[in-house]
Structure formats: C-alpha cells, structure tokens
C-alpha cells in the first residue's frame, strides 16, 4: 500500500491555498482547501491534522482518514477544520485515482452525466457593473449566470432600495434574455425582514434561484421564507458538514444546496451531501469560486451526483476578465468549455497537472487576502 510520507502547503494570492501530498511510491496528490481571509489559520489546522493523523498512514484509506479527521477530535465542524479536511480529502482522492490509473469519478461509481452545465459568476457588488460581462459570456455560449445583487443594506430598508435591486436585476435579465438562467446572490446580507420583500420584487424576473437570501446563521427561517415566495432558494456555501445539510433538508425551505468541495469535507463530504439532496428531491449546485484543483474535484463529484443543476465557475476563470487562474497554475488544458458546458477531466486522479514551478514562484506564507469591511452611514458594520 502507498504511504503518505510528506506534504507541502502553498498560499497563492489573492486567496488560494494548495496542499501537496506525496507517497513512498512517488505519487503526488493535490488538494485545494480554502483559506478565505484566514489562510494562515487553515494552514495551521492542516499541519496539525497531517502530523497527528495522516503522515505515515495508508494513502488509499480515504474513508478511514475522513472519519478519523472528523470524529477523532471532541470538537468538529466549522469552516477552519472542514476546510483543512477538505484539502486533505481531495489530495487523497487524487492519489488513489493515480494509483489505480482511474479518474476520480470512477471511484465515486462512475459518471451520471458526460458534462456539467456551467453557471458563470459575473460580479455585481456595490453597483451592478455586470451587464457587459453577462453579454460577453452569453455570446460565448454560457446558459446560466449568477450575479451579486445587494450591496450595503439596512436591516429594514426603503422601498427605493428594493426597487434598485429589482431594477439592476431587470437590466441583467434584459441583457441575457429568457433562454438563460439568471441566479441572484444576496450573499447573506439581507435580514429576515427584508428577504420576503426582495424575493417578491424579483419574482417577475423568474430567477433560477436566490442564493443566501438570509445569512446562513438564520437558515432555520428558510421554510418560512420559502412559504412567502415562488422564487427557488439556494444556500450552502457557508454550511460545512453533511449533518448540517441533512437538518436543513429535513426542515425544507431550500431548493438548491451549494456545498463547496473546499469547505464541506472535500469530495467525501460533498458526495454525501449530493446523495442527501437527491433523497429530498433537491438540486445540487457545487460552489467553487476557487482554483483549478478544487474546480476539478467539484466537477468529478457533480458528474456522479444524481441531481446536479450546474457547476459554478469563478470570474477569474473567464478569458478576457483578468488572469485566468486555470491557465496560470496548470500544465496543458485540463478543462474544455463548449456550448455552456464544462468537460470532466478524464486523466488519472483529478486529471489536473499542477504547474509546480509557477506555484512555487507565486506562493507566499500567507496569501494576505482580507475580506472588505463595509459600514453603514452611521458607522456600524454592514454585512459583506
């Protein structure tokens, strides 16, 4: 059996974190946890888990590793620990696929679909500057787009604020047309009081879904909100464990779950969440605004899950809109995009060859990313 012998971590600006595992047979596996604004903390968590549980152990025993990393401590769950587990889990799957010369989707039971429809994130914070990008991506064949819609918003805000949000989205709908799915991200910025008003104002635009219509800490109120609107509701970017998704699905109120392969327990975690979603007739739309390793892992899970709606694609993976992080950090062209769909890499493991020289050149101890702090007119902190 191949044994894990070594690991390295690389933080790449603006907010990417990569984990490299190596076995005694020379197989290298890559994982991509997410540091967000806390990459140094996630890094420390990974180091602790690797030293205490993984180095020197069987590289193929993925399920045992997952259970040990998750249940082996008295405290489990949360964004830091689950991000650390996610990166390790991805890298172990990459190793196992390479060991058996199989793509990861074959380790998950095989593909249920040949390709995944892409949902292209197009920005939209503060003021909606996304219409030009939307036009570009639709011209390129994309059939689903997602935009942020609410910037700073009070707990109880004015009719004019609601109207501005609706008008901005109406401009986007006019740009993309009715043959394109338009998803709206409220980013958890909206209070319970404002969410029904905004969802009602958006109903005539027929969005694919409204993402994080309320802050995830208040997801218990999603069934109440769902009963007040015809708009499908989505959440999951900031839900971290399969059991947390199970409780949310059992309560109802969510139409689309959006676990991140870099936050919700890696491939193992998101695979479980996808099965739970299918058992509740709920769609899966994996959330992956990160780099090529996580994107590949997400495609593998999404290709084998029963009810995948589409795969989110980050803005900086889009040609012509800044550096293409997929091209920057990979060798060759692991992803093919055609007619609004992404191919699933079919090489061994995750099917992505990381450009180690480029990665080492760009890596830092801490990527240095910090989320912005927004404030209301009175000086109080607003939700970003």
Regions found by a protein language model. Name each.
Residues 44, 48-49, 64, 206, ...:
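Shared catalytic-loop signature of beta/alpha-barrel
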């Amino acid at each position: 059996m191949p044994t894990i012998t070594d690991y390295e971590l690389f933080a790449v600006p603006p907010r990417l974190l990569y984990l490299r595992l190596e076995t005694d047979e020379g197989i290298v596996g890559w994982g991509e946890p997410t540091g967000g604004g806390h990459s140094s903390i996630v890094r420390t968590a990974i180091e602790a888990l690797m030293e205490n549980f993984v180095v020197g152990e069987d590289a193929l025993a993925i399920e045992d590793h997952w259970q040990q990393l998750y249940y082996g401590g008295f405290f489990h769950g949360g964004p830091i620990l689950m991000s650390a587990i996610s990166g390790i889990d991805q890298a172990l799957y990459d190793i196992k696929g390479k060991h058996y010369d199989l793509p990861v989707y074959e380790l998950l039971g095989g593909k249920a679909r040949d390709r995944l429809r892409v949902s292209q994130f197009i920005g939209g914070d503060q003021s909606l500057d996304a219409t030009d990008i939307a036009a570009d991506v639709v011209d390129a064949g994309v059939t689903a787009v997602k935009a942020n819609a609410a910037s700073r918003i009070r707990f109880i805000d004015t009719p004019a604020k609601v109207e501005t949000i609706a008008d901005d989205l109406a401009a986007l709908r006019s740009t993309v047309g009715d043959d394109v799915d338009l998803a709206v991200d409220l980013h958890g910025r909206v209070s319970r009081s404002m969410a029904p008003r905004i969802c009602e104002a958006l109903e005539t635009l027929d969005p694919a879904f409204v993402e994080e219509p309320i802050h995830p800490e208040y997801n218990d109120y999603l069934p109440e909100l769902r009963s007040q609107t015809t708009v499908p509701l989505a959440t999951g970017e900031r839900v971290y464990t399969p059991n947390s998704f199970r409780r949310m699905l059992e309560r109802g109120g969510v139409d689309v779950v959006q676990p991140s392969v870099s936050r919700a327990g890696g491939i193992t975690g998101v695979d479980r969440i996808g099965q739970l979603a299918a058992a509740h007739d709920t769609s899966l739309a994996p959330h992956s605004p990160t780099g090529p390793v996580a994107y590949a892992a997400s495609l593998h899970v999404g290709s084998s899950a029963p009810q995948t709606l589409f795969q989110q694609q980050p803005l900086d993976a889009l040609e012509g809109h800044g550096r293409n992080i997929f091209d920057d950090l990979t060798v060759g062209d692991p992803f093919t995009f055609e007619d609004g769909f992404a191919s699933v890499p079919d090489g061994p493991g995750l099917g992505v060859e990381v450009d180690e020289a480029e990665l080492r050149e760009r890596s830092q101890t801490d990527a240095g990313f910090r989320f912005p702090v927004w404030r209301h007119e009175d000086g109080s902190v607003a939700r970003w």
